[in-house]
Swiss-Prot record:
GO MF, one example: alkyl hydroperoxide reductase activity
EC number: 1.11.1.28
Assembly and oligomerization: Homotrimer.
Protein name, per record: Alkyl hydroperoxide reductase AhpD
PANTHER family, alphabetized: ALKYL HYDROPEROXIDE REDUCTASE AHPD
Presence of keyword Oxidoreductase: yes
Gene that specifies this protein: ahpD
Function: Antioxidant protein with alkyl hydroperoxidase activity. Required for the reduction of the AhpC active site cysteine residues and for the regeneration of the AhpC enzyme activity.
Length: 174
């Protein structure tokens, strides 16, 4: 099991992350597609080869090809959007009405349930630190019926995956 490989590779100081990874992978708060789509999208957002390959192997047992592609799409489009919208926010009100002018069709044409894609986008935006995108995607998923607990489950997955990536990077540099 790829997730077990990931957990076994973590050092002792990352024991909490290992436990969180195990607990979150068994979560019943989200549907299977939401859970593993969020795991895969956030893994891709870390830009860590080990995390991406191990989570992809595990996620492929739970997701259709459409969901795998959508998860990678969420990570990719949000990498662009999070930079652009953070910059727009940093630049202030003078830029509020400036048209973004970037293509982002995948958000509405991902090939999967809209709420599931939006949840992945929210989790990736959390990792990328974009306040405006995180809030916008949260508004969408809650208006589509997800609960605050479901939203925060995705946030916990994002936080844990980012922490695991950090530990792996630390160990690679030691």
């Amino acid at each position: 099991m790829a997730l077990d490989n990931l957990k076994e590779g973590l050092p002792e100081y990352a024991k909490d992350l290992k436990l969180n990874l195990g607990t979150l992978s068994r979560s019943t708060e989200l549907s299977e597609q939401q859970l593993w789509g969020t795991f895969l999208a956030t893994a891709a957002a870390t830009r860590n080869d080990t995390i991406i390959s191990e989570i992809a192997e595990e996620a492929s047992q739970h997701l259709s090809d459409e969901y795998v592609n959508a998860a990678y799409g969420a990570a990719s489009i949000m990498a662009m959007n999070n930079v652009a919208y953070r910059a727009k926010s940093f630049l202030g009100s003078d830029y509020a009405q400036v048209r973004m002018g970037l293509r982002m069709n995948i958000i509405n044409k991902s090939g999967i349930d809209k709420v599931d894609f939006e949840l992945m986008a929210l989790a990736v935006s959390t990792i990328n630190g974009c306040h405006d995108c995180t809030k916008a995607h949260e508004k969408t998923v809650t208006s589509e019926g997800l609960t605050k607990e479901q939203v925060f489950e995705a946030v916990k997955i994002a936080a844990t995956i980012q922490g695991v990536a950090q530990a792996i990077q630390i160990e690679a540099a030691r």
